[in-house]
Amino acid sequence: MKAIDSIPVGVSGTKSVEVTREMTVAHFQEHMPAVYGTPIMIYHMEVTAAELIQQYLPDGWVSVGVVVDVKHLAATPVGATVTVRAKVLAADDNTVTFEVEAHDGVDKIGEGTHVRAPVEIGRFLKRVQAKTQRMDEASLRKQT
């Protein structure tokens, strides 16, 4: 049985956040308006999707984001509450595909799809550690 076999298609979840100045484009680029930033919206979509399926994954497993295809449709000011919804569209092969949306109480501000891959955390971290070692070795070769 694969880790994704227990993830039900159609299950959905939501997460709400109040937009703070730290979530705005202006926090990162002072000359820009203080509105909810696209990277932060995508982050909230990813977190909502990850938290939704975590309960269905075996112990020692997490999911990592592998594809994001999102449109940011409308600006949202500081103080507004953004609600993100993630819905499982498919759980096949080794990935889970989600429909994601964000609303600010007035407008739909974002929509798209997101794909996550469940991974066994121990194996994943070993691969990251091996890559870190290869990078360190490559850096040493460049210095000589």
Region roles according to the model:
Residues 2-37:
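Catalytic strand-loop segment that frames the active site of acyl-thioester-processing enzymes
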